[in-house]
Amino acid sequence: LHLSIRRQRQMCIRDRLTVLNAEEDVEKIASMVDFVFCAVDMKKDEIRALEEKYAKAECPVVSNNSAHRHTPDVPMVIPEVNPEHIEIIASQRKRLGTKRGFIAVKSNCSLQSYVPALAPLMDKYKVTKALACTYQAISGAGKTFESFPEILDNVIPYIGGEEEKSEKEPLKIWGHIEGDVIVDATAPAITTQCLRVPVSDGHTAAVFVSFENKPSKEEILQAWKDFSGVPQELQLPSAPKQFLNYFTEDDRPQAKLDRNLEGGMAVSIGRLREDSQYDYKFVCLSHNTLLSLIHISEP
């Protein structure tokens, strides 16, 4: 099975798949698998064409790529946050002419901590603006310390395209279905700064947030504690029992200590306090290579 992949890993591939070409043997591959995880290193127009080819072959596609994230009838899902967007698949299938095949995508890994943290506060307290500075692990670039020695004892203050994705994608996630498309939300206003740091796995975000109806600190903590979603209701194998976890210690969360919480499927939050310019600020952490992609495909 010939795929361009960014990260080199030792993995076992079935013998019957090793002689197949992912671009040329679509029909054959589609007949052999239940669905496709797509994480390829190709041009965006080529990725869009390839993913639609598999979907039209009646093979569901769960994509880690950004190519289809803003296709209006392709759901970009964080399962605890916007599972209702899966309903747009019916419209997508009409466009593609499929009965079973479809495409669903995961969001950019930079926002997988702060979007869930803001989600239970959105409707009741109405988030008006947010600032997030992310400190992103090298695995997000498909790197290890061996392949990326320049990151040692260093911080790189630029990740190409990351800030644009981090500001735009949450608005689709918080959007709504209207007819045959997903319409982006118009609020909150989001600004971001994304840095690459010498950490193997786990993206950390320092978040500042303001509300139309400012909650108390206790109300925020209770909202995080009570928050759960469809993965928890369905008791999916990978679903964390507690999705949002607040640490009272001043030095938490830490990537090294907390990224694997609940098998890497939970979000860790800490240091909630009032801010002089925004209403509140806090720090949150998620495992960038594990969270979300797995249980999008589980139901």
Predicted regions and their residues:
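C-terminal active-site/capping subdomain that shapes the small-molecule cofactor and substrate pocket
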Residues: T191-R196, D201-P299
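Active-site-lining helix/loop region of Rossmann-like oxidoreductase modules
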Residues: Q10, R14, S31, Q112-Q232
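Single conserved hydrophobic/aromatic residue that forms the stacking wall/gate
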Residues: H2-R9, I13, H295-P299
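Rossmann-fold NAD(P)-binding glycine/threonine-rich loop
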Residues: E46-G97
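Short alpha-helices
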Residues: A90-K124
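Conserved acidic residues
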Residues: D34, C59, G101
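A short, aliphatic-rich alpha-helical micro-motif
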Residues: R6, I29-S31, A55
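A structured beta-alpha segment of the ubiquitous adenosine-cofactor-binding alpha/beta core
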Residues: R14-R48
